[in-house]
């Protein structure tokens, strides 16, 4: 199947992209050659499809941003496909549990999202001075506040996931959900190498395979379709040598169980009398 098949299948949908923590900062570096989900958005719009980034202060609390995602879904003119990375996936998931939001969604593709939290967030918030500094920076830059990082801790996420377990199971039975994780074993380039030390630390701490920020086990929702690939925490959303974020997204969109449109009916030509 080709890009033409994707155009035909999703012509009436709106794609909503939810960025991760500090995503608006990364997106702002596009003029200096940094890609963060923009190549995926541009590919979709290049196919003539409706694709938009949800405007979120990414350091804000998950619940606050979930309301913003829900509003974006409700404002869409038709059916929606949610594509989210990292913290953005937590907000998309929470939005889908709100009244009438899931009913408008035909798919949720979650890329490297810490549904069960991140040990790195635990470590950062365990240092009071660093926690206060992060909170102040977030407030001064308009990105949110320190609560957004606190929402990524393993304790906070475990509590939230347990409280919403039945709702999540019902959601996955209703909406096609794909969760993608990556694991960093041998960094292929300097971008993945940035996460190498964190990855080794998490393995030594007993967290298992991970992408440098999120353990594989944290990124996979029970009952959803699972995909595990190689790479660091931005490997699936950043175009670079050896990376193919568009190819990853293309593959997952083609696998969403959405009926393809029927081909045009043939024109019957009766023989002349």
Question: Which residues are covered by each model-predicted region?
Answer:
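Glycine-rich His-Gly loop
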Residues: 19-21, 85-86, 113, 182
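Active-site catalytic motif of lipid deacylating hydrolases and related acyltransferases
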Residues: 8-78, 139
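Short amphipathic alpha-helices and their capping/turn segments at secondary-structure boundaries
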Residues: 1-10, 97-100
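C-terminal catalytic-base region of ester-bond hydrolases, centering on the histidine
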Residues: 172-273
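Short catalytic/ligand-binding loop motif for oxyanion handling, primarily in non-cytosolic enzymes
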Residues: 24-26, 61-62, 91-92, 116-120, ...
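Short aromatic-enriched loop/helix-cap "lid" or pocket-rim segments at secondary-structure transitions
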Residues: 28-30, 119-124, 129, 188-194
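Hydrophobic/aromatic beta-strand patches that form the interior of the parallel beta-sheet core
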Residues: 16, 52, 107-109, 178-180, ...
């Amino acid at each position: 199947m080709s890009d033409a098949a994707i155009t035909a299948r999703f012509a009436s949908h709106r794609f909503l992209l939810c960025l991760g923590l500090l995503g608006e900062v990364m997106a702002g570096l596009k003029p200096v050659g940094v890609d963060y989900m923009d190549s995926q958005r541009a590919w979709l719009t290049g196919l003539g499809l409706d694709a938009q980034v949800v405007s979120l202060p990414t350091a804000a609390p998950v619940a606050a941003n979930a309301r913003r995602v829900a509003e974006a879904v409700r404002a869409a003119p038709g059916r929606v496909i949610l594509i989210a990375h990292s913290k953005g996936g937590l907000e998309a998931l929470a939005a889908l549990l709100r009244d009438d939001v899931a009913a408008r969604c035909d798919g949720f593709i979650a890329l490297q999202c810490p549904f069960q939290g991140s040990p790195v967030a635990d470590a950062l918030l365990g240092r009071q001075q660093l926690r206060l500094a992060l909170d102040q920076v977030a407030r001064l830059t308009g990105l949110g506040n320190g609560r957004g990082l606190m929402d990524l801790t393993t304790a906070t996420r475990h509590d939230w996931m347990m409280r919403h377990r039945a709702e999540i199971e019902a959601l996955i039975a209703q909406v096609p959900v794909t969760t993608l994780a990556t694991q960093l074993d041998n960094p292929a380039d300097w971008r993945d190498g940035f996460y190498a030390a964190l990855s080794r630390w998490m393995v030594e701490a007993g967290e298992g395979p991970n992408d440098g920020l999120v353990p594989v086990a944290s990124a996979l929702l029970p009952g959803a379709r699972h995909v595990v690939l190689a790479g660091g925490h931005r490997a699936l959303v950043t175009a670079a040598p050896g990376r193919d974020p568009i190819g990853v997204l293309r593959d997952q969109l083609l696998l969403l169980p959405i009926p393809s449109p029927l081909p045009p009916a043939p024109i019957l030509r009766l023989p002349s009398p």
